[in-house]
Regions:
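Gly-rich Lys/Arg/Thr-decorated short loops/hinges at beta-loop-alpha junctions or inter-strand turns
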Residues: 2-8, 69-83, 142-152, 179-182, ...
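C-terminal non-catalytic interaction/assembly regions of soluble proteins
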Residues: 255-412
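N-terminal phosphate-binding or glycine-rich loops at protein starts, especially the Walker A/P-loop
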Residues: 1-54
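Short glycine/serine/threonine-rich phosphate/pyrophosphate-binding segments
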Residues: 15-25, 48-49, 93-95, 115-123, ...
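Glycine-rich oxoanion-binding loops at beta->alpha junctions
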Residues: 52-107, 116, 155-157, 169
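Short, ordered loop/turn segments at secondary-structure junctions
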Residues: 11-13, 41-46, 81-82, 114-115, ...
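Accessory alpha-helical/coil subdomains and C-terminal extensions
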Residues: 38, 100, 108-113, 119-132, ...
């Protein structure tokens, strides 16, 4: 009987939950009668082009390692931001990739990633159809930005939202201690979609109203209105905390940043400095104590504060990818459909990759207040279930005990 194997890779920016999705793929292969060996390509699609593989079936033969993988941050297989050309312009990488699939007896390829990774899934799917390949191409979602279409929310977002809300509450406690007027601006990831920044509203409780203002890229930023907002708030409280997306822009579409940003291979500006830019505005126009805080990579790698709901759903979506591939599905991405909020229930399904790749899901305008400086209760209700539950992270010598990833930082 001919061997039937599969290969999985991770791509794009890391999250707390992407390794849980990888664990789900490995577990799905373990329990599948369809596939024999699960290979892992190191550093995304480049791992296939460079023939850099790991035998994940061997590495994770012990279920204890699989459990540890689920709570290990970032990407066990490493990542890349490599954009495949259109095969009509240059099919050489496609020829090579599918040659490697044949060489390894690959019958399914799973790509765990966000928008740009789904572009790769679409291109490989189209090429597979062109050459009548029987390799199933499946996308497994991942992004803290929560901007993938056709799915209720994305793996990694819930944990990042939990970290953002927790950090916002802790920052609020830090500011409460001084009886002086102050403004704290917290810059949160989100180039085109403000889901993560919106999650800062979850920090509000019976004694904390921070953040008092939330500015998202879905609404044009107005400097004069921002200054007026802050002045009005300072008339009623000593401490004002602002949550701002890194991708806020003015009515002309120009980003509000403190410096000119470079672009990655997919043409996305690598933004930073929105918080610092707002700090300058407050300093020049209001003159109170002001500081900006850039949460940066911490929001996407804090496994010690992961959402159990997020980890469990991410694992299940990895397994679902294996299931649908074994059933003959291809050119698709695993999706979540929300059934209800209370009790919180979801259904695992899938959608055609052509309806997902190169599209983006923004925060609905009717979930943002009319003033454009806060979110509505509907968004809070959407977010709440996603941050529930805590994971049991193993500790060693007082620190989290994660999977060894020394294979990722060896010199080439």
């Amino acid at each position: 009987m001919n061997q039937s194997n599969c290969i999985v890779a991770q791509s794009g920016g890391p999250t707390v939950a992407i390794n849980a999705s990888l664990a789900g793929v490995i577990a799905g292969v373990k329990s599948s009668e369809k596939y024999d060996i699960c290979y892992g390509a190191v550093n995304g699609i480049l791992g296939i082009l460079n023939e850099n593989y790991l035998n994940l079936s061997d590495i994770f033969a012990d279920d204890a390692n699989l459990e540890k993988l689920k709570t290990t941050p970032a990407m066990y297989l490493g990542s890349c931001r490599h954009k495949l050309p259109d095969y009509k312009d240059d099919d050489s990488p496609y020829v090579y990739i599918f040659h490697q699939f044949d060489k390894l007896s690959i019958k399914a390829f799973f790509y765990i990633g966000g928008n740009d990774s789904m572009d790769t899934v679409l291109k490989l799917s189209d090429y597979a159809k062109k050459i009548n390949s029987d390799v199933k191409i499946i996308g497994i979602p991942k992004t803290i930005d929560n901007d993938l279409c056709m799915t209720d929310h994305t793996p990694g977002f819930g944990s990042a939202a939990k970290y953002i809300a927790s950090s916002m509450l802790e920052i609020a406690h830090d500011t409460f201690i001084y009886a002086v007027k102050s403004v704290t601006i917290v810059e949160i990831m989100g180039r085109d979609a403000g889901w993560l920044t919106a999650a800062s509203a979850l920090a509000r409780n019976e004694y904390n109203t921070a953040p008092q203002f939330i500015y998202l890229p879905e609404v044009d930023f107005d400097k004069d209105k921002f200054v007026a907002d802050i002045k009005e708030a300072l008339a009623h409280t000593n401490n004002v905390i602002v949550a701002v997306s890194e991708g806020i822009h003015d009515a002309d579409g120009s980003y509000i940043t403190s410096s000119k940003a470079a672009c990655d291979q997919f043409g996305h500006q690598q933004l930073s400095g929105a918080g610092k830019a707002l700090e300058f505005i407050v300093n020049e126009n209001i003159g109170v104590k002001v500081r900006s805080v850039e949460v940066n990579v911490l929001q996407r790698c804090a496994s010690h504060l992961a959402s159990l709901t997020d980890i469990e759903e991410s694992f299940a979506q990895g397994k679902k990818g294996v299931t649908i591939a074994a059933e003959g599905v291809t050119a698709s991405m695993v999706c979540l459909k929300r059934i209800s909020n209370d009790p919180y229930q979801v259904e695992y399904t899938y959608s055609a990759i052509k309806d997902i790749a190169n599209e983006a899901k923004s925060v609905p305008r009717d979930w943002i207040n009319d003033a454009g400086n806060d979110v509505k209760p509907e968004l809070i209700e959407y977010l709440k279930p996603l941050i529930q539950g805590e994971t049991a992270v193993a500790y060693k010598n007082g620190l989290p005990d994660y999977m060894d990833v020394s294979h990722l930082h060896k010199c080439n």
